[in-house]
A protein has these predicted regions:
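Short loop/beta submotifs within extracellular cysteine-rich repeat domains
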Residues: 76, 130-135, 309, 367-371
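An N-terminus-focused feature that recognizes amino-terminal "leader" regions
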Residues: 1-119, 399
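DNA polymerase processivity clamps
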Residues: 43-74, 119-121, 276-309, 351-356
Length: 401
């Protein structure tokens, strides 16, 4: 593990080489997590807050219009609007409304900060490995007084000095680096806290805190990457899977069913039968979004990670390709998908009490979902005929009805 001094030096060198690089990309280059850079205040100013989303999220409606960002390694889902109905318990959260629609799984949430990244201010929540779960950004229409009240209520440290805040992230970074530089000398154990504070331009109390945590592990090590291209089941297992699949009455029954059967999602798709799950070409995402844009077909777009899923419901308009990224760039909704990372694309056909519900789903090399698309529907209603026809048009073989 890097000491603070080592990591700060490598970070400074990277910033000098690529000053405009985003924090997530810097973390990847440095072989650390984004949370590690935030916790060490490298390139950002960060104020720790209590990671108590069960208490925080019901209060987010008071902030007015915000930007809610949820992402995984390959897709970024951004939705502007105001939090409306929020239901939480210690394990899960449900956010519903015309603007913000979320499914939250709190067992993974461990750390939180208010972050100032070059003047862009957000609340950021991380898992135990330092992977970002969700970020809530201020907009021009955010109620700043309500924001400050919320942050102060849950803050674990006093606010930064106004002068330091105005100076930007470099102030906190310089202070930490100055303390670390003093503490990194051969006689580190004998370093005077007062001398370190004077060198850094901070109080002795702040210097003592920095010295105490400068090299302490903040997050657990990242789990090694895996691949999952699906296993081949024997005939009995395939038949059992198919019968269970056909017995579904609600789309949300799929995940617990796979947990019970101890099957990865990609294994289930590959074995349940082509009338229920059918692989498409990787360009299907562009075809579907182009059709939805041109015909004003309302859709649902799901993207997220192990701890949060964010949903857009409505039409999409402005589409743009930028290198490997295919983008939706609408006033209240942005989606960025790295299509080069997709190794498979599937039409997934779920039986329900309201008739079949179909989706287009992109998968990464490790078997994780990159993004999902459905036709817009409410429980109790059948899926849109135009959406069903669009999904059937992607398939070489008929889908089960």
């Amino acid at each position: 593990m890097d000491t603070f001094k080592d990591l700060a030096a490598r970070h400074d060198a990277l910033m000098a080489e690529a000053p405009g690089m985003r924090i997530r990309d810097r973390a990847r280059k440095l072989h650390v997590t984004e949370g590690e850079l935030v916790a060490r205040q490298l390139g950002v100013t960060a104020r720790p807050i209590a990671c108590r989303p069960v208490e925080i999220y019901p209060k987010l409606g008071s902030l007015g219009r915000i930007l809610c960002l949820t992402r995984n390694e390959w897709a970024v889902h951004e939705r502007y609007g105001q939090f409306q109905m929020v239901e939480v318990n210690p394990k899960v959260g449900l956010v519903l409304g015309t603007d913000i629609d979320l499914r939250l799984f709190f067992s993974h949430w461990t750390r939180a900060w208010e972050v100032n990244d070059n003047g862009r201010i957000s609340l950021q929540f991380f898992d135990r490995e330092g992977v970002a779960i969700q970020k809530i950004f201020q907009t021009d229409d955010t109620d700043l007084a309500a924001w400050q009240k919320l942050v102060d209520e849950f803050a674990l440290a006093p606010a930064a000095d106004p002068g330091a805040q105005a100076a930007g992230p470099s102030s906190a970074q310089a202070a930490g680096a100055a303390v670390a530089a003093g503490a990194g000398a051969p006689s580190a154990a004998a370093v005077s806290v007062g001398a370190a504070a004077q060198a850094a331009g901070i109080t002795p109390e702040q210097a003592a805190a920095l010295l105490a945590v400068r090299d302490a592990p903040v997050f657990e090590p990242l789990k090694p990457a895996v691949t999952d291209h699906g296993a081949t089941l024997d005939e009995a297992a395939r038949l059992h899977l198919r019968n269970r699949w056909l017995a579904m009455t609600d789309p949300h029954q799929l995940w617990p069913m796979l947990q019970e059967l101890k099957l990865s999602r990609i294994t289930a798709l590959a074995n349940v039968g082509e009338d229920l799950c059918q692989q498409t070409d990787l360009l299907a995402i562009e075809k579907v979004l182009q059709y939805a844009s041109e015909h004003e077909l309302p859709i649902m777009v799901f993207a997220g990670n192990h701890a949060a899923v964010q949903i857009h419901g409505g039409t999409v308009k402005k589409l743009m390709r930028a290198g490997p990224w295919f983008n939706i760039l609408d006033p209240n909704f942005n989606l960025h998908v790295n299509t080069d990372a997709a190794v498979s694309s599937w039409v997934v056909n779920r039986p329900t009490d309201d008739g079949p519900v179909t989706s287009l789903e992109l998968y990464a090399d490790n078997g994780d979902i990159i993004v999902q698309f459905f036709g817009l529907r409410k429980p109790g209603n059948p899926e849109l005929k135009a959406w069903r026809a669009l999904m059937e048009g992607l398939c070489a073989k008929p889908l089960h009805r």
